[in-house]
């Protein structure tokens, strides 16, 4: 088993533990005893993709609409361009507007053609770190907390991050 696959599987186990036992789990306390773990597509190396970054030089704050029809401030970091099955795609990448300048966390909200069928209808997220080489690992795509609990307010992927391809990787709908 590849090292990347082992890391993803370990990440999934830790997430299940968090959702099952942590006080801050998004699974409502009254239904947590029924929670048997999250559902995922099998790991697929096809969806661990090297991407080219196109930086955006702007301090403009973007107000991302949330599931509660409020706004959360983000700064556009740039775009990641990548290829799946010979076709090129592009996703906007964001930084939270309220974090420290040295925070290297990047946020990629997206939808694909599995959204609303096999995966959460409002979309999924991927977190990556700033680096000189970028890899998007869709095997780590996850549903926002509002997929499990309506009390959460989650950013909705902007239209520019709606992909016209099936991403059969990462987290699936919880049944």
Enumerate the predicted regions with their spans.
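Extracellular/lumen-exposed scaffold segments
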Residues: 30-35, 58-76, 90-93, 155-163
């Amino acid at each position: 088993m590849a090292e990347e696959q082992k890391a993803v599987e370990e990440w999934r186990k830790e997430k299940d533990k968090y959702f099952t036992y942590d006080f801050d789990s998004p699974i409502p306390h009254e239904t947590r005893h029924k929670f048997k773990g999250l559902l995922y597509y099998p790991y697929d190396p096809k969806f661990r993709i090297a991407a080219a970054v196109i930086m955006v030089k702007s301090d403009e704050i973007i107000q991302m609409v949330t599931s509660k029809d409020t706004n959360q401030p983000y700064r556009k970091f740039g775009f990641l361009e990548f290829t799946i099955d010979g076709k090129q795609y592009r996703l906007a990448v964001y930084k939270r507007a309220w974090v420290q300048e040295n925070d290297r966390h990047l946020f990629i909200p997206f939808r694909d053609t599995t959204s609303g069928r096999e995966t959460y209808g409002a979309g999924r997220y991927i977190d990556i770190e700033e680096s000189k080489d970028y890899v998007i690992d869709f095997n780590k795509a996850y549903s926002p907390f509002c997929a499990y609990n309506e009390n959460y307010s989650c950013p909705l992927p902007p239209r520019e991050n709606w992909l016209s391809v099936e991403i059969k990787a990462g987290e699936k709908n919880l049944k």
